[in-house]
Amino acid sequence: MKNIFLHSLSLENYRNFKNLELKTDNTPIILIGENGSGKTNILEAISLFYPGRGLRSAKLADICKTSEDHCLVKALLQSKLGLAEFTTQFKRSSNRRITEYNESKIANNELSKFTSMVWLTPHMEGIFTSSSSDRRKFLDRIVYNFDPKHTELVSKYEYYMHERNKILVEDIRDDNWLKIIEEKMADISNHIANNRLKTLEFMQHAIDDLENEFPKADLSIDGIVEQKILNGEENIVSFITAELYQTRNNDKLLGRTSFGVHKSDFLVKHQKKNILAKFCSTGEQKAILIAIILAEMNYAIKLTKIAPILLLDEVFVHLDDKRRQYLIEFFTGLNMQLWVTTTNLEGIENFATKAQLIKL
């Protein structure tokens, strides 16, 4: 098994940190400190070395320390391709983020070629009652760990969708280019939908097979394209192309694309109660979310033979002793780099003896 882990992390003008240097090993790491000390900021900085905008989905300007014109995050990381230096930096003057791998610029969506990462934060506990967009992004992030190429597909799809919207709204008379764009969107949509369905199948097996202290969930996706694939229908790409053509006039008025895989919703049910997670109690929702993360970790490692970095922000808070102990044993048993934030060590004293403690 190949482990993804940080050897060192350096922050400059990042959120509340002027400068911070951390040296780490492939062991559990506990960040301990008062609220506001910057524990979550460190996790967020690490998460920037995975496709997307990090675990907070923050605006670029927000990650830069107030009154500073730039910020920099540097990491020496054991990646899928070996030891490498990664940097990501932002300058207010350009309002752009630049990411580099061994001093060569790379696109954000290329990061999944090098890293694998999973995180769980208090903000995610409301994912079942939030927007379908949040749930869809959560599912796609899971897919990235199974299929790194999925990142590029989603990025390309969003690019072509933006181009289509622009042509329609600005009334650009170029039917040939519009036809090409819609054909590309249709082809990419088919791949995205199949990747999601394949991952959900893997995940469902993992949930059903893994006996733990958390409720089992039934996973599905509510989307027209995905449903047609599940029904065994043929000519999916032609169907999508036709739908995009037929909705042009309506989408021109709306200013957006009303049909496609960007409208699909990730649905989660409490298996035993047979009700959607959004109708469960907040405690049950947190437990179901943890169960999904456990399944993702377990199956991703089995399938890819790669152990990702795991970021847990205040996860042990409000868990009973039995579930807390199960999580500790599960994660330490995987022999991976685990980052945990907490305000105190109450309830995790034994775990702390096996971890690197960083006090903020």
Curated annotation (Swiss-Prot):
The protein's UniProt keywords, in alphabetical order, are: ATP-binding, Cytoplasm, DNA damage, DNA repair, DNA replication, DNA-binding, Nucleotide-binding, SOS response
One of the GO biological process terms = double-strand break repair
Q: Name one GO molecular function term.
A: ATP binding
Q: Name one GO cellular component term.
A: cytoplasm
Tell me the compartments it is located in. Answer: Cytoplasm
In this chain, ATP is annotated as bound at 33-40
Could you tell me which InterPro entries the record lists for this protein?
A: DNA-binding_RecF, DNA-binding_RecF_CS, P-loop_NTPase, RecF/RecN/SMC_N, RecF_2
> Which Pfam families does the record cross-reference, listed alphabetically?
SMC_N
Q: Briefly state the protein's biological role.
A: The RecF protein is involved in DNA metabolism; it is required for DNA replication and normal SOS inducibility. RecF binds preferentially to single-stranded, linear DNA. It also seems to bind ATP.
What family classification does the UniProt entry report for this protein?
A: Belongs to the RecF family.
What NCBIfam families would the database entry show? recf
This chain belongs to the protein called: DNA replication and repair protein RecF
Q: Which organism is it from?
A: Rickettsia massiliae (strain Mtu5)
Point out the gene that encodes the protein.
Answer: recF
